[in-house]
Each structure stands twice: as structure tokens, then as C-alpha cells.
Design a protein with these regions (language model features):
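Noncatalytic partner-interaction/assembly domains of nucleic-acid and motor enzyme complexes
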Residues: 1-108
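The Walker A/P-loop phosphate-binding site
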Residues: 13, 154-164
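A sequence-level detector of short, solvent-exposed, charge-rich linear segments
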Residues: 30, 64, 68, 120-124, ...
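Non-catalytic interaction/clamp surfaces of large macromolecular machines
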Residues: 114-119, 123-153
């Protein structure tokens, strides 16, 4: 599985209830960690919480819902963003659970990146000429894989001890 919408909802619920928890995850979680093929709602809510937190604004469910509505996105099943955000605030979220949930969510994001890398490698392998050297073939695959995956090892936003 490459996404978990329940984890996304749990993280958003935690941030709505405890916006100070954003500081714990801001160095390794961003909007791209939210699966948005079905609906951009969760990533949009996260981005608005992120903007409010970074701007020193209060994170209030009414204000967040208003800002989501102002974005003007259409959501599947005619979902009302205000009702959805209200449902998030009603979720039970254990105290101090934001960091743990964010680390679990990051695992899904990494899986999606690995999947995308493998798809890009497959495309590249199909386009390499038959007379290409072994070295060229391997280096082509390596460059695609490493350009995405090394981010998690070496990048400034790499989470610490994600698998603990």
C-alpha cells in the first residue's frame, strides 16, 4: 500500500487540536507527503495549517475551513470541507501522538517515491539502445533512483530515526 488516508486524517486532527506540535514535524513533513490522487483536501488542509503556524496565526477550525473554501477546489462526492474539518476535530488523538503519526505517514510517502522511481527506471530501460554498455545501463538506473531516494538519507529534511 502506498497511502493511508486514516493516518493523514489522524495527523491533521492532531495538528488542529495541538498546533504547537507542528514544530516537531515541520522539518520532514510537507504537502507532498499527503496522497492527493483521489482528492487534494488533506494536503490543502495541511498547507493552510502550515501557513497559519508559520505566520503566527491561530489554528482554528472555522478559519481553516474558510481558507480551504477560499482555495476554490472541488472535492469528490461534493464533500463539504467545513464538515470534514469538524469531523477531524472530533477524532480522538492521544496526546503527543503527532510525531509518531508523522513518521508513519512519511513511510508511505517514501514508498510512493520508490514506486515513482521504479516506474521512471522502467521507462528509461525501455529507451536505452541495445548497444549501451553495462555501465551506462546501471548508471542510468542509479541516477534516477539516487536522485529521489538519497533525499531521505542526506537531505536537510531527513527525519531522524524514522524506523524506530
Amino acid at each position: 500500500m502506498i497511502y493511508n488516508l486514516e493516518l493523514e486524517k489522524q495527523l491533521l486532527a492532531g495538528l488542529l487540536k495541538d498546533p504547537e506540535g507542528f514544530a516537531e514535524i515541520s522539518n520532514f513533513i510537507d504537502t507532498s507527503d499527503f496522497y492527493s490522487e483521489n482528492s487534494p483536501l488533506n494536503s490543502t488542509i495541511f498547507r493552510i495549517i502550515q501557513q497559519a503556524t508559520n505566520g503566527g496565526d491561530e489554528v482554528d477550525e472555522i478559519i481553516i475551513a474558510q481558507r480551504v473554501n477560499e482555495v476554490g477546489l472541488s472535492f469528490e462526492d461534493n464533500l463539504n470541507p467545513s464538515d470534514y474539518i469538524k469531523s477531524l476535530t472530533l477524532r480522538k488523538v492521544p496526546a503527543g501522538n503527532i510525531l509518531k503519526t508523522a513518521k508513519e505517514l512519511k513511510k508511505y510517502s517514501i514508498r510512493r517515491e520508490i514506486l515513482r522511481s521504479s516506474q521512471d527506471i522502467a521507462k528509461k530501460m525501455k529507451s536505452i539502445t541495445p548497444d549501451a554498455s553495462y555501465r551506462n545501463i546501471v548508471e542510468s538506473a542509479d541516477s534516477i533512483y539516487n536522485s529521489r531516494i538519497n533525499l531521505y538519507e542526506l537531505g536537510h529534511d531527513a527525519p531522524q530515526n524514522i524506523y524506530e
